[in-house]
Swiss-Prot record:
Top-level taxonomy: Bacteria, Pseudomonadati, Pseudomonadota, Alphaproteobacteria, Hyphomicrobiales
Protein name: Thymidylate synthase
SUPFAM superfamilies named among the record's database cross-references: Thymidylate synthase/dCMP hydroxymethylase
Protein EC: 2.1.1.45
UniProt enzyme class: transferase
Source organism (scientific name): Brucella ovis (strain ATCC 25840 / 63/290 / NCTC 10512)
Annotated residues for binding of (6R)-5,10-methylene-5,6,7,8-tetrahydrofolate: 51, 169, 263
Reaction it catalyzes: dUMP + (6R)-5,10-methylene-5,6,7,8-tetrahydrofolate = 7,8-dihydrofolate + dTMP
Cited PROSITE patterns: THYMIDYLATE_SYNTHASE (PS00091)
Gene: thyA
Described function: Catalyzes the reductive methylation of 2'-deoxyuridine-5'-monophosphate (dUMP) to 2'-deoxythymidine-5'-monophosphate (dTMP) while utilizing 5,10-methylenetetrahydrofolate (mTHF) as the methyl donor and reductant in the reaction, yielding dihydrofolate (DHF) as a by-product. This enzymatic reaction provides an intracellular de novo source of dTMP, an essential precursor for DNA biosynthesis.
C-alpha cells in the first residue's frame, strides 16, 4: 500500500514536532486524505504483518454494542487492555455510541440499524452518517473516539465510506483503522445488495510518536506487495449475524511485524 507509505514519509518530512497528552512527543501534520478502491484488493499493510484476528474481532465487538473487553479477551485480542478498568469496562465508547446513543427524551438510538434502513429506503441520502463523538459522554469514556465519524455514499450500485479520524496514530493505529472500515464497508455492501466502492480516510491530527520514528523508517525501506482478497460468507444477509468464521483473507503476504510501544 504505497498510499500508506506516502503518509508516513509526508509526516516524517513535513510534520511539526509537538508535545502530546501521553508525554511521549509526536511529529504531526494536520489534515491528510487517503483513498482506497476496494475493487483493487483488501487494503491491509503488506510492509508489516497485521494481526487480522484483532481487526475482525474488534469490529464485531463494536457492532455488538459491547464496551467490556471480556469478548475480546476470550478471542485473544489485547488491543484495549491498557484502557479498561479492573472490571474490563471502558465506559460509553464506540459500540455504545454506534448502537445505543442516548437521546434527551430517554430513548436510545441505534445508529447502525438506522443506517441500514436508510441504505435500503433512501440510498441517495446525504445523511448516511454514524458518529461516535458524543460531547456529553466524552469524559466518561476510557479513551475518547479517535475515529469519530463516518459517512456512506451510494453511486452506480457501489457503496463508499469516508471516515473522519480526529487523532491518528499512524504507525500503530491507522493500519488497523484502514482495514477495519474497509471491512465494515464490504459487510454493509453485502447486506444491502451493493458492491464495495471506495474507502476514503480523512485524518485530522496525523502523528507519528517519537518512539516510532525508527520503526517507521524501517517500514519505508520495504516494498509493498500485491493486495490480498477478502472473502466474506455470501450467505450472511444480516450485519449483526456475522461471525469471525465468515471471513477469509487469501493471498496475504507481508513482511515481518515491526514492534512499537503503545502510548497510553
Amino acid at each position: 500500500m504505497r498510499t500508506y507509505l506516502d503518509l508516513l514519509q509526508h509526516v516524517l518530512d513535513h510534520g511539526v514536532d509537538r508535545d502530546d497528552r501521553t508525554g511521549t512527543g509526536t511529529r504531526s501534520a494536520f489534515g491528510y486524505q487517503m483513498r482506497f478502491d476496494l475493487e483493487e484488493g483488501f487494503p491491509v499493510l503488506t510492509t508489516k504483518k497485521l494481526h487480522l484476528r484483532s481487526i475482525i474481532h474488534e469490529l464485531l465487538w463494536f457492532l455488538k454494542g459491547d464496551t467490556n473487553i471480556a469478548y475480546l479477551k476470550e478471542n485473544g485480542v489485547t488491543i484495549w487492555d491498557e484502557w479498561a478498568d479492573e472490571n474490563g469496562d471502558l465506559g460509553p465508547v464506540y459500540g455504545y455510541q454506534w448502537r445505543s446513543w442516548p437521546a434527551p427524551d430517554g430513548r436510545h438510538i441505534d445508529q447502525i440499524a438506522n443506517l441500514l434502513k436508510m441504505l435500503h429506503t433512501n440510498p441517495q441520502s446525504r445523511r448516511l452518517i454514524v458518529s461516535a463523538w458524543n460531547p456529553a459522554l466524552v469524559d466518561e469514556m476510557a479513551l475518547p473516539p479517535c475515529h469519530c465519524l463516518f459517512q456512506f455514499y451510494v453511486a452506480n450500485g457501489r457503496l463508499s465510506c469516508q471516515l473522519y479520524q480526529r487523532s491518528a496514530d499512524i504507525f500503530l493505529g491507522v493500519p488497523f483503522n484502514i482495514a477495519s472500515y474497509a471491512l465494515l464497508t464490504m459487510m454493509i455492501a453485502q447486506v444491502t445488495g451493493l458492491k464495495p466502492g471506495e474507502f476514503i480516510h480523512t485524518l485530522g491530527d496525523a502523528h507519528i510518536y517519537s518512539n516510532h520514528f525508527e520503526q517507521a523508517r524501517l517500514q519505508l525501506t520495504r516494498t509493498p506487495k500485491k493486495l490480498p482478497v477478502m472473502h466474506i460468507n455470501p450467505d450472511v444477509k444480516d450485519l449483526f449475524a456475522f461471525r469471525f468464521e465468515d471471513f477469509r483473507l487469501d493471498g496475504y503476504e507481508a513482511d515481518p511485524t515491526i514492534k512499537a510501544p503503545i502510548a497510553v
